[in-house]
Every structure is written in C-alpha cells, then in structure tokens.
C-alpha cells in the first residue's frame, strides 16, 4: 500500500504520494489513449538498427570529449567552471560573456545545460538498447549530483547550476532522468525530486510560456505517480493562455522556430492523453497537417532554417528536429495508433536522420537539406546565416551546439516507440517496422516475438513467436499507408503460434512525386537521391572526428526530368536489390532512370551556394541515365529535380509603396490591423513611390527604402505590377516575404504568414491565380514586429515575387 509523505517547503505543506519499490518493468501510463509504451526491457533493436546505435555509442554519443565546449565539461555534475565563445554569441542577450566560477553562475546562462542535457538523454537512450555501461555511468553520476543538490527551500533542481530563470533546460534533463528510470527503475528519486521542483514553482508555473511551458510533459508524468491533480489543472491553464493554443490548426503559414514548434506540437496530444478531451487531439493533428502542408520536404521532415521556411528543396532543416519531431509523433501513436504519424516517423528515421550524419556517426550537419551538392564551410545556402556558418558541413560539433547534443536522441527515440501495447488487451503492437524483438507475457507464459527483416530495404517482415510453452499470441501490426495492399494505413491482427513464422508482405512501388516545379523518386518510406561526383577532403587527416569538405564538379548535376518520359520509366523500372553489410552506408537498392541535361543549374551560386531548381529549364538535347539510391546512404545529393515543362516567366515590372508607415501591434493578428491603403486600387500606388530592387533576383528591400526612419512595430504596403500579354488561367505567383505578411490579389486575401519570416531567403509560397492580359497587381502588407533590428538582419523586411504561366505543376 502506498504511503503518504508530508513534505514541507517554506512553511507550506503538500502531500506527495510515495511510490514504493517501483521496478524497471513497472510502468504507469496516461489514463487515456488506445496504446501505451512497452517496458524498455521488452524491446531490442536488431540488424541495421542495432548497428546504428552501436555506431552512435562509438561516435559522438560516446565521445563527448571530442565535441568541445560544453560537452567536454562535467555536464550537469556541478556548476560549469567557465564558458567559451569561439564562433559566435548565443546567450539570450546578444552580449558576449567569457566568465568563470561564481561569475558564470550569476550570468544566468542556460544554453550549455540545454545542450548537455540533450547529450545525457541520448546517452541514456542508447544505453537502453545496446550494451553501453560507460554511458549509463555518466548519466547516473549526473543524476546523483542534481538530485543531491536540489534547493532545500523550494526543491528547485536547476538553481545550483545557474541563476537563469529559464525552465527549459529542466525539460530536457527530465527526459534524460526518465530514460534512465525506464531502464533502471529509478522512479522513486525522479518522482520525489521533480514533484518537489514543480511544487516549489506552483505560484508561477501557470505563467510559463514558450519553452518553459514544455515542462507540461514532466508535470503530467509525475502526476501519474503522485495523483496531484493541481499539476494537470495548471498544465491546462498554461496551455489555454498560450500562443500555440490560439495558432495550432489555423489554415495559415505558421512561421515558428523549428525546435520550439516540434516540441510544442506534442502539448495538445499530452493533454488529450491525460484528460480524454478529443478537442486537444483534433487540434494537434490539424497543427501537424498544416505544418506539413506549408513546409514539408522530400525526406519526410519540414523545413526549419531555425524558422520554418517553406517547401522548396534549397531550404534545410535543423538536425535537432529529427529527434524532437519523432518524439512528438510518438505521442500520437499512444493516442490512437495514427498510422499516418507512424509513416512520418519512419520517413524521418530512414531518410532525414541518416542523411544528416556520416555513417560512422562521428560527424553531422547542423542544417541538412534534400538538395546539397556542396557541404563545406560557409556553404550555408538557407536564409538564416546565409554564407556565414559551417552548418551544412559534416563536423563533429557545430555552434551553437544544440544539434550536436540532440541528434543523439533521434534513433533511440524511434526504437523506443517501435513496439507498444494495446491498453484494452495488453496485446503487443508492431507500430514501427524494422529488425527487432519484443518480449512479453501471456497467461503466465513468457514469450518473445522476433521481427526478421531488412525493412525499409526489403518488402517483407517475418514475425516468429518463441516460447517454452504451447502458446498463441495475437499481435497488431501497422501496414503503412503507402503500401500496395487493400488494408494499407491500418493496424491488422496477426496470430502467432509458438515456433511458427508469419510473413507480412509490404509491397512498395517506385513512384514519381511532384511538388510545384520540382520532382523526386520515392519507394515506400524511402526517398531516393542522385549522388553527384564530388571531391571530399578531410580537414585534419587521420582524426576520425575531422570535418569534411565536399565540393561538387560543375556540370555533373544539372539535370531535369522530362515528366512524360520519367512517368513511363518509373512504371517500367526494375529496382536492383543488393546484398550489403550496413544499408545506411552502402545502397541496398538502386534504380537507373532517364534525365535531361539543362543549360541552367550547373554551377553554384557565387561559387559556394546551392541554387534553387530553375522555374524554367531549357534542355540542351543531351539525354542521360543516372542512378538513384536511398537518401539515407548519401552525404552530398540531388533529390529534387526541375522539369522541362514549357513555362513563361512574366515580367514583374515594378513594386510601389505609398511611402507611409503605420503602427503595428505584434500582439494582435495582422489581419485585424488594416489601414487606408488596403482599400485603394492598385493604381493608387503607381503615382507614388517606386521601390528599387536591391538584389538581382528582384528582392524589393522595404527596410532599405525606409532607411533612417523608425521601423520597429510598424507595417507598410507594397504593390507589385506584373505584365502579361495574354489571359492565362494556369498562372502561379511565387511570393517570398517577411516579416509578417498578408497578400491580396484583386482585393482577396491569397496568403498570410504568422510569425517571423525572412523576405529574401524565405522559400516562396506558390499561389495559383490566373493573370489577365495587361497589368496585374498583388498588394502585400508587411509588418516589422521589432524583435530583430534591421542592422542585425538587413534583408528581413521586404518581398520577392516571381510569376509564371503555363506548364504542369505538382500539388
């Protein structure tokens, strides 16, 4: 019987339900949702998934001393002695700090602890699934120190490490503590320590917003043990007043930091799991669908060059998000076994994640992209830190160091959710496919299910039941939504008998995928890429963790698809399956397909940046056949190709402003802040001021136009004039604009973006709207919220428009 323990903080008492002898196998679960996590000990990866984790343990996960600051410190085992800034500034106030001892503690810096907590979580999770006692030992030492040094007055677990008011590092550290407890049964210490931490902050926790609000995850987990209903009440109150509750599910482009967004997307799912209120789950699902609608990339993740940035394949995504998004999607699986979310998890795990790191797991990218012929220092072609960072290079560590720590969580988080249990029956569920085994018990008899497969590199999974007793076990297995069978997208029942094997066919077709004016090849969960010839140079030969410089050969990747030819070729293609040792390193399958060489797209922009696929491609007449291999095996790659469809680019003749700045309140929706120019006809602008383009790609720089005036917290209007010599129903307006944006054609809103975007390097949104013969107009309302200065990011405020007519476009 559980005992009640009285805990006193500053004269105030609360009751903490003490949980006696919680073992590693004793899991509690959220009260709602159809499925629950299985005990860690029940799950074991095999084959190439086990090898991935072993390489992690031998790579950056197991060698933090190779990664520089802050990983070569004591991590959370005591306050850090010193902070170093070698490549930039990142401490919340943009003032460099190089301090030590008490001075460091007083500085209130939180970021070294975020990054080292990521590392500890990754270490704990890898050690869940492979034999890595050294990793377990590091995690235990850090937990011991933190639990022993909680503030005696209010239970604060972070106050001994930093004076920072940020609650975000504890979100990350909680997951490391939870991972360790899942394996070792260390729930007593976790629950007591974190319950005290949350109780000591009872008076302020409902006011937590942003990343502080992500403590909701730990609060609800602790509530499973303590039954403290105030934790749920405050979690609901926290979310109710949040920006996310007001924004998630809205059918508009939400521009948000990729890590913050992927972390926050789990909050309404968690609230559903603990309340059963369907509205939370519906909002969460709508929010995920909206993010993918606006920002999806061909490798299964969404763009986030720090901030979400549209769909085009020059955009990248922060490697942190491979971990954060899979962690979030896993909660959808617990809620209702959503097969579409599981499909997304597999596409991230089998494409985006391995495509962002070297195959020995000793180097990774900060920003990874589906099209990256060049991967070297200062080759960063996405809008954020354009040309000013090493983020596209494969390195052991980057600055800031968040991705270096966070990537360690990615694959073990995927493995953690491979097998679940159905709550109603206790039946095992193969939710994510791959070589693995599951151990369970039925009617007092122990059993083991072994999944033999090379999936996703083959089209079959074989399930064998092993038991010392005659036994029949009915399990559930997910059939992916892309699968060429009538029950695709469902969970199906498989009945296994001891000693017998049941095979599940997973037929996959080669498909041609299209989006706007670029196209790529896919097979089941795998995205396929072309690897252009390149020169790879080690910066420090002989160092197994040295950075790589990958430079393509000009003219060896400027291909496009003839769509009719490619459709026929894909339908008739024979995929070559190969026997390889490690399919994340050597291609286990390949296919050769026809392409057309084009005059455009054969050199890097400015000699070092990956250009966009051209809107209008001109074939040279040369036909070639190139090999496509799994994205996961590549470093440099071309995944998305332009086409040879005939399009006509229409001239954007000019852009006009009325020369006025209007007051803007960042706390209110942009659509609710309208001024007189919104009522004007386009010609009301043309007699006023013409805004000169400040970039060869016709970026109209509003910030430069208003130079010398106070622009923070203002908005203005910009009208584009476009000429067409004919009426054309099949026309596309490609708009890139920032900061906050609302666009109109013929007085009708055609696009809105909520959040910070960057006008020059934002991927264009594609707006289908006909053009008429003569002049055509688009008016764009542009708000400057004032959080970033024009001096710091001079290209943020403005817009770029490309309009073309004709051709066949994807969705």
Predicted feature residues:
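N-terminal secretory signal peptides that target proteins for export/translocation
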Residues: 1-9
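Bacterial N-terminal signal peptides
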Residues: 10-25
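Aromatic (Trp/Tyr) and acidic
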Residues: 28-133, 164-185, 212-230, 240, ...
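Extended carbohydrate-recognition surfaces in non-catalytic/accessory domains of CAZymes
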Residues: 52-104, 110, 114-121, 134-142, ...
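Asp-box/WD-like beta-propeller blade repeats and closely related beta-sheet repeat scaffolds
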Residues: 162-167, 174, 187-210
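Aromatic-lined ligand-binding clefts that engage carbohydrates, nucleic acids, or primary amines
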Residues: 474-478, 723-743, 778
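Beta-strand-rich ligand-recognition modules
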Residues: 487-499, 505-518, 742-798
């Amino acid at each position: 019987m559980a005992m009640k323990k009285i805990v006193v903080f500053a004269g105030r008492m609360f009751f903490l339900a003490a949980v006696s002898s919680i073992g590693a196998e004793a899991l509690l679960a959220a009260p709602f949702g159809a499925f629950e996590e299985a005990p860690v000990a029940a799950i074991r990866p095999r084959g190439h998934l086990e090898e991935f984790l072993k390489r992690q343990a031998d790579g950056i996960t197991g060698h933090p001393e190779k990664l520089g600051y802050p990983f070569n410190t004591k991590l959370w085992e005591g306050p850090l002695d010193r902070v170093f800034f070698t490549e930039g500034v990142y401490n919340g106030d943009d003032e460099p700090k190089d301090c030590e001892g008490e001075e460091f503690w007083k500085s209130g810096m939180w970021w070294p602890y975020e990054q080292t907590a990521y590392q500890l979580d990754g270490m704990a999770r890898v050690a869940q699934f492979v034999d890595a006692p050294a990793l377990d030992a590091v995690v235990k030492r850090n937990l011991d120190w933190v639990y022993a040094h909680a503030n005696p007055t209010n239970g604060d677990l972070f106050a001994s490490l930093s004076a920072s008011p940020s609650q975000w590092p504890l979100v990350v550290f909680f997951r490391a503590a939870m991972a360790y407890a899942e394996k070792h049964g260390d729930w007593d210490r976790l629950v007591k320590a974190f319950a005290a931490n949350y109780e000591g902050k009872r008076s302020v926790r409902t006011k937590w917003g942003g990343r502080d609000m992500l403590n909701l995850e730990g609060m609800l987990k602790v509530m499973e043990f303590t039954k403290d209903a105030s934790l749920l009440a405050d979690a609901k109150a926290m979310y109710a007043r949040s920006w996310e509750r007001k924004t998630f599910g809205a059918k508009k482009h939400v521009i948000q930091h990729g890590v913050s967004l992927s972390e926050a997307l789990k909050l309404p799912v968690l609230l559903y799991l603990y309340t059963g209120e369907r509205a939370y789950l519906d909002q969460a699902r709508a929010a995920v669908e909206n993010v993918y609608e606006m920002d999806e990339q061909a490798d299964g993740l969404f763009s986030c060059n720090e901030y979400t940035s549209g769909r085009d394949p020059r955009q990248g995504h922060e490697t942190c998000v491979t971990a954060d998004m899979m962690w979030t999607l896993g909660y959808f699986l617990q809620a209702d076994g959503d097969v579409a979310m599981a499909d997304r998890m597999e596409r991230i795990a089998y494409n985006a994640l391995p495509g962002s790191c070297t195959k020995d797991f000793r180097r990774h990218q900060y920003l990874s992209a589906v099209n990256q012929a060049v991967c070297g220092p200062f080759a960063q072609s996405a809008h954020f830190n354009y040309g000013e960072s090493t983020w596209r290079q494969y390195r052991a560590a980057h600055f800031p160091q968040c991705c270096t720590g966070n990537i360690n969580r990615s694959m073990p988080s995927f493995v953690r959710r491979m097998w679940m249990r159905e709550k109603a029956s206790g039946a095992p569920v193969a939710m994510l496919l791959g070589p693995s085994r599951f151990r369970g018990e039925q009617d007092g008899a122990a059993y083991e299910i072994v999944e033999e497969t090379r999936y996703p590199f083959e089209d079959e999974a074989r399930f064998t039941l092993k038991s010392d007793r005659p036994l029949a076990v009915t399990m559930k297995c997910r059939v992916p939504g892309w699968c060429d069978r009538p029950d695709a997208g469902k969970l199906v029942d498989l009945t296994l008998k001891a000693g017998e094997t049941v095979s599940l066919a997973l037929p996959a077709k080669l498909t041609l995928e299209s989006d706007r004016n670029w196209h790529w090849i896919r097979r089941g969960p795998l995205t396929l890429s072309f690897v252009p010839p390149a020169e790879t140079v080690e910066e420090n030969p002989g160092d197994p963790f040295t950075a790589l410089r990958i430079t393509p050969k000009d003219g060896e990747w400027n291909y496009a698809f003839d769509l009719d030819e490619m459709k026929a070729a894909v339908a008739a293609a024979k995929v070559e399956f190969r026997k390889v040792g490690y399919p994340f390193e050597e291609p286990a399958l390949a296919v050769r397909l026809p392409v057309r060489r084009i005059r455009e797209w054969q050199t890097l922009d400015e000699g070092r940046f990956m250009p966009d696929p051209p809107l209008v491609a001109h074939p040279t007449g040369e036909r070639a056949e190139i090999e496509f291999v799994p994205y996961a095996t590549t470093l440099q790659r071309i995944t998305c190709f332009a086409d040879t469809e005939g399009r006509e680019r229409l001239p954007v003749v000019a852009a006009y402003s009325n020369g006025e700045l209007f007051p803007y309140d960042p706390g209110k929706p942009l659509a609710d802040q309208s001024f007189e120019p919104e009522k004007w006809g386009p010609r009301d602008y043309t007699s006023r001021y013409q805004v000169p383009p400040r970039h060869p790609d016709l970026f109209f720089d509003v910030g430069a136009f208003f130079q010398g005036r106070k622009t923070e917290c203002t908005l203005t209007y910009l009208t584009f004039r476009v000429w067409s010599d004919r009426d054309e129903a099949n026309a596309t307006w490609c708009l890139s604009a920032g900061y906050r944006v609302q666009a109109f054609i013929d007085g009708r809103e055609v696009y809105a973006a909520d959040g910070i975007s960057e006008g020059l390097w934002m991927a264009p949104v594609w707006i289908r709207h006909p053009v008429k013969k003569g002049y055509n107009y688009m008016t764009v309302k542009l708000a400057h919220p004032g959080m970033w200065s024009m001096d710091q990011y001079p290209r943020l405020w403005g817009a770029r428009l490309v309009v073309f007519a004709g051709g066949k476009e994807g969705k």
